Amino acid sequence: IFLHLEGAKSGVYVYINGQEVGYSEDSKNPAEFLINKYLKPGKNSLVVKIFRWSTGSYLECQDFWRISGIERDVFLFSQPKTHIKDFNVVSTLDDTYKNGIFKLNVDVANHTTAGKDVNVSYELLDAAKKVVAEGNAPCNVTADGQQNISFEAALNNVKTWTSEQPNLYKLLISLKDGGKTTEIIPYNVGFRRFEIKPTDQLAENGKPYVCLFINGQPIKLKGVNIHEHNPETGHYVPEELMRKDFTLMKQHNINSVRLCHYPQDRKFYE
């Protein structure tokens, strides 16, 4: 069982049933605490103690409203004792900008006192829910340890992601223990390729212009800065306001956003 704090500023102590669980001071990144050993049957007490200033405040002292407290969602979640801890996806294009290159790395964690033999698999589905890539591999995870599993696939004539046509594929990562599926994680995947390279056009100094390319096409950035701020709730920004901001950006032909000066809430990227 994990306690997940999406964001709190600036120094955070967590206590369960009067026992200190841990400390975090990275205000704009999530903090997770494994809390099993602090819990008891029945009702439990959870206390989060927040300090306005911490040793991390020097790095976080940027030009914005300095508001302290819980700034994002806080929730509990549970996973099997042997579970998918993390994963990383690379989804880009080859030099033709037509074919997809897919790479998946999965970290499996084992919180038991004995080694575990599990199976990790994935499926990549297109918009019609057709499987376009799949794979599976056995995974031996040592007691109280972690193991990485990697997959690669090449996809011909993928539906690429662009701002105008944001085609997405659905990735399903599964974990089986003893032949039984214990975990399935869904994730959206888009195939696109970013490059910064010189063009054939020369500037007045005789040197070629250097441009940003997405899927082989030069892109002119029309961007804005955005802060995580709400006139009614301070630094807590609900999903409805995020969507409203994106709608306004689209209406004004904005195609890029600079996040000032920190990672945004996970929902912002999704």
Predicted segments, located by residue:
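Conserved, mostly hydrophobic/aromatic
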Residues: 18, 74, 106, 169, ...
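Accessory beta-strand-rich segments of carbohydrate-active enzymes
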Residues: 1-86, 111-112, 256-269
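Surface beta-strand/loop "capping" patches
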Residues: 81-113, 203-211
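N-terminal carbohydrate-binding accessory modules
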Residues: 172-251, 269
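Short strand-edge motifs at loop-to-beta-strand transitions and within beta-strands
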Residues: 29-33, 145-153
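Beta-strand-rich binding/interaction modules
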Residues: 99-140, 147-151
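Short glycine/proline/serine/threonine-rich loop/turn segments at secondary-structure transition edges
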Residues: 39-43, 115, 155-170
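Conserved aromatic beta-strand anchor motif in extracellular beta-sandwich/beta-rich domains
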Residues: 14-18, 120-126, 175
